[in-house]
């Protein structure tokens, strides 16, 4: 099966439809997305390779997915730590933080010190809707993820990448190439620039909605929330 990519406009419209005619709440979608990310991390980095996972969390929904993933990783036996410098005030994110705090998952202020003592990084800073300039404190964080030898898993899009054009031509993120990408719902056009292990996650789309947005839902096996795909399985 050749999986079609979703543009930023189509992906945003799909999210709105899932929360209207699809009858999902944003909490449900974030929970299922974060669960997918946690399964991908467990697949590529089993605990025997190191339990410490640093989750870099941004201020939007991508960051929410990261908080959910951190919680699930804790329950799998990992030792997550969360870097969350820009916290929204709304109730959804505050509840996600509380859930992690109740598990005594540490929130760290110094990303760079935490990076020196972790086994894996989850990049949940910016997602498919990112555009414009990377603002503080994230430029140095993205550059550090680009330079580290620690494996990095990005959520839906490598942070700073344009959804269509991939990595910036220069500046922040121009040399950021994570090891793993988890595309949520469907791949985005930027995957043509990505060379690592690629998963699709988000096992919640009804066939009628997939047909309307002209993309294929991959075949998930058993109880898996992710499917690993190869370059020749994506239609740009």
UniProtKB/Swiss-Prot annotation:
Question: Pfam families this protein is in?
Answer: YjeF_N (PF03853)
Cite the EC number: 5.1.99.6
Task: State the organism of origin.
Answer: Neurospora crassa (strain ATCC 24698 / 74-OR23-1A / CBS 708.71 / DSM 1257 / FGSC 987)
- Which EC class is this protein assigned? isomerase
Q: Which reaction does it catalyse?
A: (6R)-NADHX = (6S)-NADHX; (6R)-NADPHX = (6S)-NADPHX
GO molecular function terms attached to this record:
metal ion binding; NAD(P)HX epimerase activity; nucleotide binding
Q: Which GO cellular component terms are attached? A: mitochondrion
The molecule here is called NAD(P)H-hydrate epimerase
Keyword NADP belongs to the record: yes
